Swiss-Prot record:
DNA-binding region residue numbers: 90-114, 142-166
Source organism: Dictyostelium discoideum (Social amoeba)
Composition skew (Acidic residues), residue ranges: 30-40
Keywords: DNA-binding, Nucleus, Repeat, Transcription, Transcription regulation
Entry's localization field: Nucleus
Domain Myb-like: 172-223
Biased composition (Low complexity): 234-382, 389-415, 450-464, 483-521, 555-593, 611-636
Organism taxonomic ancestry: Eukaryota, Amoebozoa, Evosea, Eumycetozoa, Dictyostelia
Domain HTH myb-type residue range list: 60-118, 119-170
GO molecular function: DNA binding
Protein name: Myb-like protein M
InterPro entries in alphabetical order: Homeodomain-like_sf, Myb-like_DNA-bd, Myb_dom, SANT/Myb
Region Disordered, residue ranges: 27-69, 226-530, 550-636
Pfam families on file: Myb_DNA-bind_6 (PF13921)
GO cellular component, one term: nucleus
Length: 669
């Protein structure tokens, strides 16, 4: 075994110089007292025994005393009992011993001292080398080491290792080297390193015991590891050997230190490399994570932007579609409204023309009283006031023509239907109808006094001639209304007969009188306060007559309000026309408490009315008399006339009179 293996061991055990291995292994009393199992395991060992520090002893009179040493008699008796009972029944052996020794003490003393398997004496170089190897492997586990080393106890192994450490700590002196070399040369072939160790211990050149392995190692160092025999040593050689041995030892120490430093440097380098690798790994990991996060965020933002763009495009497209639909819907609604307004205006215009034509037809044949006859349930009318009715019908005809022209102009300018105000209709009550051939039946007087449409004096006397209509007041008869408001020239009847109230000549004369008035009777005039302007006129709309007031030329308004004014006045004229056709020449007026100011819209200009009226007359004059609606009555009217009980009237003569061109020209003029 080399010196380096010995020097690497831990040198923490200090052994006194008085330690003598020969005395330990050869004196059995020391083995029993100082190095027995009892001293090692149970209690400490002192040189001076005392009852307070000793272990268990004999019990005498109830008091334990200090144990005695193992005597030769006790050793022989223990040897005999173990041979009889074996190495397992230690309690029984202790009882056989007389109770002075316990079973544990008997077992330890047998295994460590008296057992024939235990090898006693010093350790040779081979056992010591094996011990050092086992200590390097197992450390301080002495029981394990003792099992590997045959015939040696754990205590022997421990003390031998401590002795070898102590001998290596003390340096060799030159005298020891001379005795070592000399003794080896003397022994020659019968060389035993154990005997050399014992010989050096007897000389006592030093206070340290040299083991057999240490003597062998020192001799190999002195001889140069070749085993050659050196020349005889003197003092100078011994000093040189000492210096050389010290140098070799120092070199070994330096070598070991260098190796340790190199190992430390390598460890430091490895640690640095490991740290760099860890840092690189962490940096790479962080960079990868950052790149991944950035890529993900960029992709997510791009997707959001694309989605927003798509959503905006969709919204724009949707808004465009909605705008197109709204525009189309608005255009369609406007077109439909325009079409409806045009159709309504055309229908109203046609109805107004038809109504005016039917009125002209009735007026040309002096059939104005027959309109009330057709709608009445009685047999014959009274012929009183026919002249007044003819005049009113002529006025209504002219007013309707003017209103039709105005409506046509307004419809061309504005495509909106007129707002016609229609008051509650005043139905006339026709009474006292008699047949010309039969005797007249007197009619019963009315239960209520008749009413007529008059104008208040406040409106007639206004200097601005606004001609507004107020609430009508009752009058005794239609003649009073005629004398106060309407100024018409009266002509005497050309023919006289018993029945002068109704005749064809009277009808013709009355019609001629109406035509000679220069169409002044179409409008109601007011003669008070020097204002000769027309006050109102008759207008027919949808089969009903209304009174329409006419403004002065100075009070001109927009044409957009003419349609409403005409329609409101048509309702009034319808009531007046029906009241004029009453058999008793009276008007049945349903009075109410409301004012007529709400029924009076803005009036129209007289110049425009006259121009429209002239145009209408010119258009009528261009048509042939036979083809005009005035030339022949309607079939329905003829059937109604035939169904009544009027046997005094011949329709053929009436058609003949209507076909005369002279009468038609007079009506047109």
């Amino acid at each position: 075994m080399t010196e380096s293996l010995i020097m690497n061991n831990i040198s923490k055990y200090n052994i006194s110089p008085q330690f003598n291995s020969d005395r330990i292994y050869n004196d059995p009393s020391l083995m029993d007292d100082e190095f027995s199992d009892n001293e090692y395991d149970l209690s400490p060992k002192d040189d001076v025994p005392s009852p307070s520090k000793r272990g268990r002893g004999q019990i005498q009179n109830g008091i334990r005393r200090s144990p005695n040493k193992w005597t030769e008699e006790e050793d022989q008796k223990l040897f005999q009992l173990v041979s009889i009972y074996g190495e397992k029944k230690w309690k029984r052996i202790s009882a056989e011993m007389g109770g002075q020794k316990t079973g544990a003490q008997c077992a330890q003393h047998w295994k460590r001292v008296l057992s024939p398997d235990i090898r006693k004496g010093p350790w040779d170089e081979d056992e010591e080398e094996l011990l050092l190897r086992l200590v390097n492997q197992h450390g301080s586990s002495w029981k394990k080491i003792a099992k590997r080393i045959c015939k040696r106890t754990d205590i022997q192994c421990r003390y031998q290792y401590l002795k070898s450490l102590q001998s290596r700590e003390v340096a060799w002196v030159p005298k020891e080297d001379e005795v070592l070399v000399k003794k080896v040369d003397e022994m020659g072939e019968n060389l035993s390193w154990l005997e050399v160790s014992e010989y050096l211990a007897k000389l006592k050149h030093t206070n340290t015991l040299r083991t057999a392995l240490e003597c062998k190692t020192r001799y190999l160092q002195l001889t140069g590891k070749g085993g050659s025999i050196l020349p005889p040593l003197n003092q100078s050689n011994v000093s040189s050997l000492n210096s050389s041995s010290a140098n070799t030892f120092n070199q070994q120490l330096q070598y070991q230190q260098q190796q340790q430093q190199q190992q430390q440097q390598q460890q430091q380098q490895q640690q640095q490399q490991q740290q760099q690798m860890n840092n690189n790994y962490n940096n790479n990991y962080n960079n990868n994570n950052n790149n991944i996060n950035n890529n993900y965020n960029n992709n997510h933002n791009n997707q959001n932007n694309n989605n927003n763009n798509n959503h905006n495009h969709y919204n724009n497209h949707y808004n465009q579609m909605n705008n197109n639909n709204n525009n189309n819907h608005y255009n369609n609604n406007n077109n439909n409204n325009n079409n409806i307004n045009n159709n309504n205006n055309n229908n109203m215009y046609q109805m107004n023309n038809n109504n005016s034509n039917s009125n002209n037809n009735n007026k040309s044949h002096n059939l104005s009283p027959l309109s009330s006859i057709i709608d009445s349930n009685t047999s014959s009318p009274s012929f009183e006031g026919c002249e007044d009715n003819n005049n009113n019908n002529n006025n209504n005809n002219n007013n309707n023509n003017n209103n039709n022209n105005n409506n046509n102009n307004n419809n061309n300018s504005n495509n909106t239907p007129p707002n016609i105000f229609r008051p509650l209709p005043h139905k006339p009550v026709v009474t006292g109808l008699t047949s010309p051939t039969s005797s007249p039946i007197p009619s019963s007087p009315p239960l209520t006094p008749p009413t007529s449409l008059t104008l208040p004096s406040s409106t007639l006397s206004s200097p601005s001639c606004n001609n507004s209509i107020r609430q009508p007041s009752p009058s005794p008869s239609i003649k009073t209304f005629k004398s106060t408001i309407v100024s018409t020239p009266s002509r005497p009847s050309p023919s006289s007969s018993t029945n002068s109230a109704f005749s064809i000549n009277n009808i013709i004369d009355s019609e001629n009188n109406n035509n000679n008035n220069n169409n002044d009777n179409d409008n109601i005039k007011v003669e008070d306060n020097g204002c000769n302007e027309p006050v109102m006129k008759k207008v027919r709309s949808n089969g009903e007559f209304y009174y329409q007031p006419i403004k002065n030329k100075l009070n001109n308004n927009n044409n957009n309000n003419n349609n409403n004014n005409n329609n409101n006045n048509n309702n009034n004229n319808n009531n007046n026309n029906n009241n004029n056709n009453n058999g008793n020449n009276t008007l049945s007026y349903n009075s109410d408490n409301s004012s007529d100011d709400d029924m009076l819209p803005k009036l129209k200009n007289n110049k425009q009315i006259l121009s429209n009226f002239k145009n209408h007359n010119n258009n009528q004059s261009n048509t042939s008399p036979m083809s005009s609606p005035i030339s022949s009555p309607h079939q329905s009217s003829i059937e109604k006339l035939k169904a009544t009980s009027f046997d005094f009237f011949k329709l053929e003569s009436l058609a003949t009179l209507a076909s005369q061109s002279q009468i038609v020209n007079e009506l047109v003029n």
